[in-house]
């Protein structure tokens, strides 16, 4: 299991900003936690404009939607960006997260924090099921 935090780099291109393997710390006997990501303000700030299509998920700043997404085998979702901070967990199958810096293969247990940057998806041979929580950010001006 690992977490990938993706967003826009200093040049405005989408990239992996951080990648870590899960390392659990015991908080109580027999109970351990691994911190994936923290926000510092609510609603989260506006994200830089992307070059891909803006997909409006209809999420008001500070509110969220929570979905399971099933990607058919080989499905390609074109490059796009959203006005959301997304938290995704791969549950079944595999999928490539495609950023301006390349393709990143994700398998069950992998987690992604997508900070509104350009990205695309390409499902593996068995398809993919992911759980996604999308938190609305402040709209871009």
Identify the residue ranges that each predicted region occupies.
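Ligand-binding loop in jelly-roll beta-barrel domains
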Residues: 49-52, 62-64, 72, 96, ...
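A short, N-terminal "cap"/entry segment at the start of jelly-roll beta-barrel domains
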Residues: 1-69
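A short beta-strand-loop-beta hairpin characteristic of the jelly-roll/cupin
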Residues: 76-108
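Short, surface-exposed charged micro-motifs
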Residues: 4-5, 87, 111, 120
């Amino acid at each position: 299991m690992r977490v990938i935090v993706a967003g826009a780099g200093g040049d405005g291109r989408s990239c992996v900003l951080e990648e870590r393997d899960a390392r659990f710390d015991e908080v109580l006997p027999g109970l351990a936690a691994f911190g994936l990501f923290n926000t510092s303000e609510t609603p989260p700030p506006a994200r830089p404009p992307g070059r891909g299509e803006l997909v409006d998920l209809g999420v008001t700043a500070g509110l969220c939607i929570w979905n399971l997404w099933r990607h058919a085998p080989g499905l390609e979702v074109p490059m796009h960006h959203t006005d959301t901070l997304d938290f995704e967990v791969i549950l079944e199958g595999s999928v490539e997260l495609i950023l301006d810096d390349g393709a990143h293969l994700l398998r069950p247990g992998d987690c992604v924090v997508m900070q509104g940057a350009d990205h695309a998806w390409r499902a593996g041979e068995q398809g993919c099921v992911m759980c996604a929580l999308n938190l609305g950010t402040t709209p871009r001006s």
